[in-house]
UniProtKB/Swiss-Prot annotation:
Domain of life: Bacteria
Enzyme Commission numbers on file: 6.1.1.4
GO molecular function terms noted in the UniProt entry: aminoacyl-tRNA deacylase activity; ATP binding; leucine-tRNA ligase activity
SUPFAM superfamilies found in the cross-reference section: Anticodon-binding domain of a subclass of class I aminoacyl-tRNA synthetases, Nucleotidylyl transferase, ValRS/IleRS/LeuRS editing domain
Keywords: Aminoacyl-tRNA synthetase, ATP-binding, Cytoplasm, Ligase, Nucleotide-binding, Protein biosynthesis
Catalytic activity: tRNA(Leu) + L-leucine + ATP = L-leucyl-tRNA(Leu) + AMP + diphosphate
GO CC annotation: cytosol
Name of the protein in its database record: Leucine--tRNA ligase
Motif 'HIGH' region location, chain numbering: 47-57
GO BP annotations, alphabetical order: leucyl-tRNA aminoacylation
């Protein structure tokens, strides 16, 4: 076969558009809803259509694409879809700022970002694309909501929530940072509003147990974070009888995991919203004002843990269940109404928050646990020590319970109090039910109707979807749906009377909790997912995304999979068999600081750098004025630090393949990647060298393909061995280890070996050809445009190519390198047959001229370490 000639220089901007057009024309990445044979579902977390891709996107989607292309080469049908997480606050805020409808803003962004993703060369089945803001998608979300509401898995209740007064919406606890809204930065308030909740707590035990099934496929860090978030604890509910029965007859029930410290209780603390607190405040204006102050703060657990401890005595008392001693009841801002019963038994001697509170308000502190292994450790009531909170040690100052250790004490208190109706053992979870109502416009409408006669009624299934009006330009003052009678005025499905449609929309985490399943059959009109498509493609074999989603998104998606399973929509218990959490992309930061401390950040593209001989930055100047800026070090690429690198600029200058290779080579995927212009140039040089190697080979015009293995020269044997070692390593690095950086390093070694090889006959040419076509095929997952273009010169269509098989015979070595030492010092090396005899090896070692000059005396000892060395002791 005659081999064609190619341009000697690599021109990425010429080849990439034509290759991408070829893929699109032939729909080479399209898969059916059901396929025969081996198949695999690879999914990277879908993007929010913010307007432009950032480097985090590029890294995420390149990782997914490398894995997808690898398995296609292995002969599997691969589903790799793409879509848009399109609802949410940012779109609404941007729409307010630009005075445009969120729908228009969103779909314009999608169009631009879709084009950017296609230019990355992703092997995506674009026929499966959808945006979550379309009625065709959220129809089925509403359908599931209705089913779950009817089953009691969704309920409505008045709830104290975090209210962001700027964004005019409820925030989840995780969206409150240091008492402020995560997006607006406004001080968060507390409000009581009616909200819909998913009973995720009904699934808490299963969500916890099933983490064990993910042990081999998920990072331990993520499993640990989820276990801690679900937070299963076994404790005791203890009732402290009321000492003021005329005011509050019921007493106080608390939940504790430290029942062993019961004899150290010196006060009881309740949340500001607790019924006892409200009762005590009825005739106490000062207490009522304090309760209102507490209500203005965040309800996020992390914030309460670190906030200044505030409290006020209610004037009410309860009785210690064992001793009958009267204990004061305090309102404390560190007690959560949403956890347990909203009341805690305070043991200042052995709980750090109680200790801090008791010292601030001069409350008694009573030690009831000794210091295990530290008999000489004195208990100080003024300075907290780590051992105070330990479960180790024995009870002291606890009367009949003295000397008991943790579990024995727990059992003893339960045995004493349970018959009196004052205690019972209880399992509790830290996980709270998921509040999904959002007082915003740009979200999925909640399919509920409020009727004065019938209460809350689900929208009939034949009236779904409840379609969100899209021609709305919000002005920032609350939810525009509340100003649209044409949306909210309706009839009650039960009584036919006038009713009001729910104007709250769903938390956008709901959309991203089931999108992975919809990709299996995105056009299906009969339900959330076509049953046979779900059976074929689910669960996702490999999921890829940032570790920042370890708790919320991944927990909610796991929850939704179980909900859909119980509705008969999907099979199996878990949505994602394997999870890869990629690290952040870091870049240099540069800034100037004003006298008032305000920092102005400059983009790296606008900075002129001076480096020392080791390449380290020693000075930086802003190109706009030539003046110096401060070098801030490498941080995560972000808008706030203005250190993002535009992927489009890299693609325009170097091509997508260079961006992909750099991203995969610069760091292991689960670690932070430090952006480096020199690294990008290095990746580009590597691809240019591959191109030149192929151009040079084609220039010679020799078409020999048949390898005569029995008559290979030593150099040809070495190149074949390198070729097949590389196949072995790249396969293992991609499939098992996800070590894409070392896979590329192995390809660089094969390139070097191929460049050094000089073919002397047709057999050599065939070996060189094998090395080059193998290099191109193994490189294809990383640099698909270049590989497809160059493989075509050898008559191979990349889209139909298969991953090379390892020839075991090529890996065997006929010769070996032996080190020769005299008195333990290296004096020479031998290249000998692998089956050489010991006597022959010693003879050749002694015959080496560079060895002979050191053999001046009689040889005392001859040491041979097989396959490694000869040591002659003289």
């Amino acid at each position: 076969m005659t081999i064609s000639h190619i341009d000697p220089e690599y021109q990425a901007n010429t080849i990439e558009p034509s290759v991408q057009q070829d893929w699109e024309n032939r729909k080479v990445f399209k898969v059916a809803d059901t396929v025969e044979g081996k198949h695999r579902y690879i999914l990277s977390m879908f993007p929010y259509p913010s307007g432009k891709l950032h480097m985090g996107h590029v890294r995420n989607y390149t990782i997914g694409d490398v894995i997808s292309r690898f398995y296609r080469l292995k002969g599997e049908a691969v589903l790799q879809p793409m879509g848009w997480d399109a609802f949410g606050l940012p779109a609404e805020n941007a729409a307010i700022a630009h005075k445009v409808a969120p729908a228009k803003w969103t779909f314009e962004n999608i169009a631009y970002m879709r084009d950017q993703l296609k230019k990355l060369g992703l092997s995506v089945d674009w026929d499966r694309e959808f945006a979550t803001c379309t009625p065709e998608y959220y129809h089925w979300e509403q359908w599931l909501f209705v089913q779950l509401y009817k089953k009691g898995l969704i309920y409505r209740k008045l709830s104290t929530v975090n209210w962001d007064p700027v964004d005019q919406t409820v925030l989840a606890n995780e969206q409150v940072e240091n008492g402020r809204g995560w997006r607006s930065g406004a001080l968060v308030e507390k409000r009581d509003i009616p909200m819909y909740y998913f009973r995720i707590t009904d699934y808490a035990q299963e969500l916890l147990d099933d983490l064990d099934t993910l042990q081999d496929g998920w990072p331990q860090q993520v499993l640990t974070m989820q276990r801690n978030w679900i937070g299963r604890s076994t404790g005791m509910e203890i009732t402290f009888p009321s000492a003021n029965t005329e005011i509050y007859a019921d007493g106080l029930t608390v939940y504790t995991t430290r029942a062993d410290t019961l004899m150290g209780v010196t006060y009881v603390a309740v949340a500001a919203e607790h019924p006892l607190a409200l009762k005590a405040a009825e005739n106490n204006p000062e207490l009522a004002a304090f309760i209102e102050e507490c209500r203005m703060g965040s309800v996020a657990e992390a914030d309460l843990a670190t906030a200044e401890k505030k409290g006020m005595a209610t004037g009410l008392f309860v009785k210690h269940p064992v001793t009958g001693e009267e204990l004061p009841v305090w309102i404390a801002n560190y007690v959560l109404m949403s956890y347990g019963s909203g009341a805690v038994m305070a043991v200042p001697a052995h709980d750090e928050r109680d200790f801090e509170f008791a010292n601030k308000f001069n409350l008694p502190i009573k030690q009831v646990i000794d210091a295990k292994g530290a008999d000489d450790a004195d208990y100080s009531a003024t300075e907290w020590q780590e051992w105070y909170g330990s479960k180790e040690g024995k009870l002291v100052n606890s009367g009949e319970f003295d000397g008991l250790e943790f579990q024995a004490a727990f059992d003893a208190f339960l045995a004493k109090l349970e018959p009196q109706g004052l205690a019972n053992s209880k399992v509790q979870f830290r996980l709270r039910d998921w509040g999904v109502s959002r007082q915003r416009y740009w979200g999925c409408p909640i399919p509920m109707i409020n009727c004065d006669t019938c209460g809350q009624v689900t929208v009939p299934e034949d009236q779904l979807p409840v379609v969100l009006p899209t021609d709305v330009v919000p002005d920032g003052s609350g939810n525009p749906l509340n100003k649209m009678p044409e949306f909210y005025e309706t009839k009650c499905p039960c009584c036919g009377g006038d009713a009001r449609r729910e104007t709250d929309t769903l938390d956008t985490f709901v959309e991203s909790s089931w999108y992975y399943a919809r990709y299996a059959s995105p056009d299906f009109t009969g339900g959330m997912v076509k049953p046979e498509a779900a059976k074929n493609w689910l669960p996702v074999n490999q999921y890829i995304g940032g570790v920042e989603h370890a708790i919320l998104h991944l927990l909610y998606a796991r929850f939704f999979h179980k909900l859909m399973r119980d509705e008969g929509v999907v099979q199996g218990n878990e949505p994602f068999t394997n999870l890869l959490t990629q690290g952040m992309v870091l870049a240099d930061t540069f800034y100037r600081e004003a006298e008032n401390g305000k920092k102005t950040w400059f983009n790296p593209a606008d900075i002129e750098l001076e480096r020392d001989e080791k390449g380290r930055i020693i000075s930086a100047k802003y190109s706009g004025d030539g003046q110096e800026v401060i070098i801030g070090g490498q941080e995560k690429m972000s808008k706030s630090k203005n250190n993002g690198i535009d992927p489009q600029a890299i693609i325009d200058q170097y091509g997508a393949d260079t961006a992909r290779v750099f991203m995969m080579f610069a760091a292991p995927p689960d670690q932070s990647l430090e952006w480096s212009d020199a690294g990008v140039e290095g990746a580009n040089r590597f691809l240019k060298r591959v191109w030149r190697l192929v151009a040079s080979f084609l220039e010679k015009g020799n078409s020999a393909t048949a390898i005569d293995k029995a008559n290979l020269s030593k150099d040809a044997q070495d190149l074949r061995r390198k070729t097949h070692e590389t196949i072995q390593k790249v396969s293992d690095d991609i499939e098992r280890r996800h070590a894409f950086n070392t896979a590329i390093a192995a390809l660089m070694e094969l390139l070097n070996a191929s460049n050094k090889f000089e073919a002397k006959d047709d057999n050599d040419v065939a070996v060189e050809r094998e090395a080059i076509t193998t290099l191109l095929t193994l490189l294809a997952p990383f640099a698909p445009h270049l590989s497809q273009t160059l493989l075509a010169q050898f008559g191979t269509d990349l889209t139909e190519a298969t991953f090379p098989e390892v020839d075991a015979s090529a890996l065997t070595r006929n010769t070996q390198t032996i080190v020769v030492q005299v008195n333990g010092k290296l004096r020479g090396k031998l290249e000998v047959s692998v089956d050489i005899s010991k006597d022959e090896l010693l003879a050749q070692a002694k015959a080496l001229p560079e060895v002979q000059q050191f053999l001046t005396g009689p040889t005392k000892k001859e040491i041979v370490v097989p396959n490694k060395l000869v040591n002659l002791v003289v």
